[in-house]
């Protein structure tokens, strides 16, 4: 080979934005991208939360900054792209990690507004953000979109029905992005995490029965950590995954095998 494979993982000169990056999976992915050379913009609804993350990343030698955006507000989703470009001159990598799930229980107990909120944050926001970014990415020779879905999008969870529906939609959206934008050099892939130890999923892993069942079913019998997803996200964001688009990558310890 005429190229060192390590060079394909190098993200130096790339600009990345990670939504839902104030903690958990988003924060871990932002750190991973930064450690491989990317300039990282961390975003969430509350500016002070991601400012703290950006400060920690900068203290580690990573080029990072913070921007606030509510992914359930389409104007804010689009404005986030504009702000990143204004600040850094371009955008190459998008990680759509922001998500919401305000209900835990049967679909019958959820009203229309709850479903609309879930779909807005988990599906429509990522779409509008990416649509805004396409011309920017195209002008820079392409880019990479990594959508954080869920194994619930592949095998719906009974008590997380509407959330599972939204993640199924995000997986399908990822494939449409890959088909429509591949000719412009823009790749799109989805990561489907299993049970990860984050604040977002604490209602599950703090439930002794749920945790015991998950650990018994998974070949890798431990709960996942946010850092377990960072390497996969870096791979998909980098040229090491240059031939990967429309893919659905499961990281669940083998739970769904």
Report the location of each language-model feature.
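Residue(s) in the substrate-gating loop at a strand-loop-helix junction
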Residues: 150
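Substrate-binding pocket helix/loop in short-chain dehydrogenase/reductase
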Residues: 105-107, 111-116, 214
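The beta1-alpha1 cofactor-binding region of Rossmann-like NAD(H)/NADP(H)-dependent oxidoreductases
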Residues: 47, 68-80, 112, 228
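Active-site helix of classical SDR
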Residues: 130, 166, 174
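C-terminal substrate-recognition "lid" of short-chain dehydrogenase/reductases
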Residues: 127, 222-251, 256
